[in-house]
Amino acid sequence: MPRSMRHFPYVAFRKFRLLLTLALAAFATGCAPDAILVNHAKDGGGEPDTFGYRTWKRKGVEPDLVVIGIHGFCGAAMDYANLGNHLLQHQPKTALYAYEVRGQGSDPIHARRGDIGDPNQWYDDLEAFTQLVEERHPDAKIIWYGESMGALIATHALHAAPAGQAPCDGLVLSSPIVRFKNDIEPWKIALVQVAATTLPLARVSLDAIAPEQDVQMTQEAKHHQQSQTNSYNIEKHTLRLLATLGRLIDGMNNCAAGMQVPVLVLHGGKDYFNDDADMRGFIARIPPGISKTYKNYPDAYHLLMYDEERERIFRDIGHWLNKRRRD
């Protein structure tokens, strides 16, 4: 069955049509990424949603596999540069497209940065972007690659697909947060949910929620230090966005039980948010008939694409992608 016939029925299909801006003059991308805009023109009027994305594609080569990158919390499409450049060098028939996630620091609507009204908007954006990539490369296999928060979005979007109608051919989850740490008191999680119901648009900083807690993200950088160097960093987020992330984390193990495509899970042994046992518990819930691969890097941290072990990690990703290419 053609992939275009296998899309799951998000409202996005009825509401959005995909247009490319005049930036498509840069369509044939070489070894350097180009920022191109996607226009989600909504039927029935209203301002269209426009988001940027970056492409790593070997010039003159038609890919037989395309990776779609969904970046993490306070991240950006450029976070995929290290992986994209690795693939350009070692897998010329693999292209990587990474888009700017709604409500994050590169959202063109400034008032929307640090906020999300409904997580279905994230899923709709991913599905619409996937359709754009499929229209451009109709014969290529599609792999979703979510990092951290992006892993939450990709997993839940896939979970919403009807059985037998998966919108991608495989899933890479890099540093997914699959459960809350045991040292996080349940009442704190419940308090955020209640506060988000009462004051959904109130904004708070992460420092206000977790004072004096600066998480190590790579061997060389902690969260505060790393975020301050990013032009796309957001200082404060709405309570409803934080509550949404809490619900997505809480639902990850349920999503695992409904997994319907091959999955690769990447985890750093020094990741602050989850440990090896958490990952193994998540993977154990994936149905027996689904191909699942788990890679644990004992000395790595949360941001694996920036980690000192990234070349080893990228080689493992490349081996897994080649298996999907042969499926």
Feature map (PLM): residue ranges:
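Catalytic nucleophile-loop/oxyanion-hole region of alpha/beta-hydrolase
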Residues: C74-A77, G105-V133, H137
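The serine-hydrolase catalytic nucleophile loop
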Residues: F73-N85
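Conserved alpha/beta-hydrolase
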Residues: L88-H110
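Catalytic active-site module of serine/aspartate enzymes centered on a nucleophile-bearing elbow/loop
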Residues: D299-D327
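Conserved alpha/beta-hydrolase "acid-adjacent" motif
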Residues: Y272-D278
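Short beta-strand/loop motif that positions the catalytic acidic residue
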Residues: M259, V265-H267
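Alpha/beta-hydrolase-fold enzymes
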Residues: M149-T238
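N-terminal cap/lid segment of alpha/beta-hydrolase-fold proteins
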Residues: A32-R58
